[in-house]
A protein has these predicted regions:
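Solvent-exposed, conformationally flexible loop/turn segments
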Residues: 56-61, 126-127, 174-182
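Hydrophobic, glycine-enriched assembly/anchoring segments
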Residues: 179-217
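Short, low-hydrophobicity acidic/polar segments
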Residues: 1-70
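Tryptophan-paired
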Residues: 1-5, 87-176
Length: 217
């Protein structure tokens, strides 16, 4: 990570992960989003103001109270998985259109710095679940209608094949509270792994009413 005056910038992902998705949505560079970032700022300090300073001893020494705010959002993905799940070895994903830079004094994302970030996934074929989490500074799609949040999956099969699946989830993020600045965003859906005429396919359906998409190898 690096600081540029009051701005914090996300760092590039490892080359091995970046090679899986490339630019993810064709425009965004892949970056590793931050951990739990908190920041705060005081425009001025008034000695004696009980909201800012407080006495710590009888000798009237004062300490500065700095209000802090969380500067990252959490997107939680929860999928039920059905079908021939034993054929899927690993699942990777990346979310495009997220912000890669933030102003630490205000918490506002710095516009024009869209990126894609990897999603941490846990796949449980026996339990029929796929869960993922990604931390983001914010969503560039909130600032521009031209920016889309494309979620890219890469399913690796036991036979070594790779099944790509890309979904535009811009509206799902907005409908889940992402556009209103919620710090916790929940996205749910279902995945069905099928064999159709000898072709393995993955069908995804979103809980919030999006149409099905179908991709396969």
């Amino acid at each position: 990570d690096k600081f540029e005056t009051t701005q914090l910038v996300a760092k590039p992902v490892s080359s091995s992960l970046a090679s899986i998705f490339g630019k993810a949505d064709g425009k965004s560079a892949m970056v590793e989003q931050p951990g739990w970032i908190f920041s705060g700022v005081l425009q001025e300090i008034k000695v004696g103001d009980p909201l800012i300073t407080e006495e710590t001893s009888s000798s009237a020494k004062s300490s500065i109270v700095m209000p802090m705010a969380r500067r990252v959002k959490v997107i939680n993905f929860n999928f039920t998985v059905s079908g021939v799940t034993n054929e899927i070895k690993t699942v990777s994903a990346a979310l495009g259109g997220v912000a890669s830079k933030i102003d630490l004094t205000t918490g506002a994302i710095v516009a024009g710095n869209q990126a894609a970030s990897p999603v941490t996934l846990t796949f449980n074929p026996a339990g029929g679940t796929l869960q993922g989490t990604v931390l983001i500074f914010g969503n560039e799609a909130e600032l521009s209608d031209e920016v889309r949040n494309n979620l890219q999956f890469a399913f690796e099969t036991e036979s070594g094949r790779r099944i790509p699946l890309e979904e535009d989830i811009t509206e799902q993020l907005k409908n889940s509270g992402g556009a209103e600045g919620d710090l916790q965003i929940k996205i749910e859906g279902s995945l069905d792994v099928r064999y159709d005429a000898g072709l393995m396919t993955v069908v995804i359906e979103w809980l919030r009413g999006s149409e099905e998409d179908l991709e396969g190898l």
